[in-house]
């Protein structure tokens, strides 16, 4: 007879030090002028307007050997738990436009107060495609696929790639993020050096970033700078212009890879 363990309930309150008001039309225009997709920015502002102050219940887990840590552990050591995270209106948000190829700086770090934008390279999950484009997305464990939707930035721990940030999925398209260990981290395979390095199988340059196991991965240098700015309350949107609504089932959704220009 199987014994079912009761869920352990934990309250996790994540909020930035200073909540800000919605950006003005002038700030919105400034942000868009720096390459941020208008639809993605509109979705971000609308989501914040509709959900600031809201609490989201999360399916999470505790580790038997370090119950007070947010570090991942093997499935055999996990105890199911629930957490509650609360969204406030942050000053810094991020949009990752997975419509764009990995060779574009598709990670947009956005200051909603000033309208300043900084762009970075970011990798997608191996299960989403081992080419320059991410074409498949899901909320499925062990798929190694990127999940679309809004995330709340959590705490930091020291992982395999150094400083690593937990992320809480806030929609049906990504609400298994914690259990899937979808986190923001740095990686050696992100940056122009990797793009221009030779693929040993072909002898030709990779012409793309490397791929993760489903996480958004920045370069190691940029992760050490960006993660401390986002932790505990920033909001991150994994975006694709053609798949946001379809992704809400949590099942795999896909698009064809864009044709190469001759």
Show where each model-derived region lies:
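A conserved hydrophobic position in a structured secondary element of the catalytic/binding core
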Residues: 218
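Bacterial N-terminal signal peptides
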Residues: 6-15
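Cell wall/extracellular polymer interaction/catalysis modules
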Residues: 21-213, 221-229, 234, 238-262
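Positively charged n-region of N-terminal signal peptides that target proteins for export
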Residues: 1-4
């Amino acid at each position: 007879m199987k014994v079912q363990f009761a869920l352990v309930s934990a309250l996790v309150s994540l909020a930035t030090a200073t909540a800000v008001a919605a950006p003005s039309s002038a700030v919105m225009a400034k942000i868009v002028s720096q390459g941020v997709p208008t639809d993605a920015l509109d979705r971000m502002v609308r989501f914040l307007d509709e959900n600031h102050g809201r609490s989201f219940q999360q399916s999470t887990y505790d580790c038997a050997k370090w119950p007070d840590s947010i570090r991942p552990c093997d499935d055999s050591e996990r105890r199911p738990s629930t957490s509650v995270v609360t969204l406030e209106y942050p000053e810094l948000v991020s949009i990752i436009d997975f419509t764009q190829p990995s060779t574009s700086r598709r990670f947009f770090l956005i200051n909603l107060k000033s309208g300043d934008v900084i762009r970075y390279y970011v990798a997608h999950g191996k299960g989403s495609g081992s080419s320059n484009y991410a074409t498949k997305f899901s909320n499925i464990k062990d798929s190694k696929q990127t999940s679309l939707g809004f995330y709340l930035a959590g705490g930091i721990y020291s992982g395999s790639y150094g400083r690593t940030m937990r992320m809480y999925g806030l929609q049906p398209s990504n609400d298994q993020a914690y259990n899937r260990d979808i986190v923001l981290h740095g990686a050696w395979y992100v940056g122009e050096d990797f793009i221009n390095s030779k693929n040993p199988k072909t002898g030709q340059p990779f012409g793309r970033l490397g791929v993760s196991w489903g996480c958004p991965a920045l370069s190691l240098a940029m992760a050490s700078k960006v993660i401390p700015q986002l932790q505990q309350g920033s909001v991150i949107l994994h975006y694709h212009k053609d798949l946001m609504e379809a992704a809400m089932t949590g099942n795999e959704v896909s698009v064809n890879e864009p044709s190469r220009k001759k």
